[in-house]
A protein has these predicted regions:
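A short beta-strand motif characteristic of beta-propeller blades
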Residues: 3-9, 45-51, 86-93, 130-137, ...
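Short loop/turn segments immediately following beta-strands, especially the blade-tip
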Residues: 167-175
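Hydrophobic alpha-helical segments and helix pairs
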Residues: 83-137
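A short loop-to-beta-strand structural motif that recurs across blades of beta-propeller domains
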Residues: 36-38, 74-76, 121-124, 163-165
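Surface-exposed loop/turn elements that mediate protein-protein interactions on large endomembrane-trafficking
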Residues: 39-40, 77-86
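Beta-rich, blade/repeat-based domains predominating
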Residues: 9-24, 53-68, 94-111, 136-153, ...
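Conserved beta-strand positions in repeat-built beta-propeller and related beta-rich domains
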Residues: 22, 27-32, 68-73, 111-117, ...
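Beta-propeller domains
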Residues: 26-51, 72-75
Length: 189
């Protein structure tokens, strides 16, 4: 059995999206409802908290440094050194109760994130040229986005529907197609 240790009492209201920053060898995560981003150096146990003016659902690493993030105000860049946020675009600006929830960066650097808070939510992709594509609709709470090791499939969970979907994924173009329900746990305890 694994020995699990409590590293830090961050007291999050809604802690999500742990992200290992291999560049700094540090762990980042968000407290969505607390409007905070946490940074922890597991070797020195130096802990930093950044107070953010918006709810951040997820962070992703940028090749040029800093982070891309999905927030209640859409997609943005964030520089922890200055705590500066530069907003890019908000594909859900017409939905004031909507925010972004979970997401991930694919192998070629596109940032994927799902919206949450409306009756029908979506899965979006932010491309390198900063254009945004809506790739899936009719979702409740898109969560847990990831890819198969060979990058042939994209997976994500729709938490409220208790389903994990699998799409065929084209790495070169970032297109998804042929959704199947890979796991349906709606009737399971």
């Amino acid at each position: 059995m694994a020995d699990i240790q409590h590293l830090f009492p961050s007291q999050d209201q809604l802690g999500e999206g742990p992200l290992w920053d291999y560049r700094q060898q540090q762990l980042f995560w968000v407290d969505i409802d607390g409007k905070r981003i946490h940074q922890l150096d597991p070797v020195t146990c130096i802990y930093t908290v950044f107070h953010i003016p918006v709810k951040v659902g997820v962070l992703g690493l940028r090749r040029c440094g800093g982070f891309v993030m999905a927030t209640q105000n859409g997609f943005a860049f964030w520089q922890p050194e200055t705590n500066e946020i530069s907003y890019i675009t908000d594909p859900e600006a017409d939905k004031p109760l909507s925010r972004f929830n979970d997401g991930a960066v694919d192998r070629v650097g596109r940032f994927w994130a799902g919206s949450y808070g409306a009756k029908s939510n979506h899965l979006y992709r932010l491309d390198a040229d900063l254009s945004v594509q809506r790739l899936a609709s009719g979702l409740k709470i898109p969560n847990g986005i990831g890819w198969s090791p060979d990058n042939r499939y994209l997976y994500f969970t729709d938490s409220m529907k208790h389903k994990i979907y699998r799409y065929e994924f084209e790495l070169e173009t970032g297109q998804i197609r042929k959704r199947i329900t890979w796991v349906d746990s709606e009737k399971q305890p």
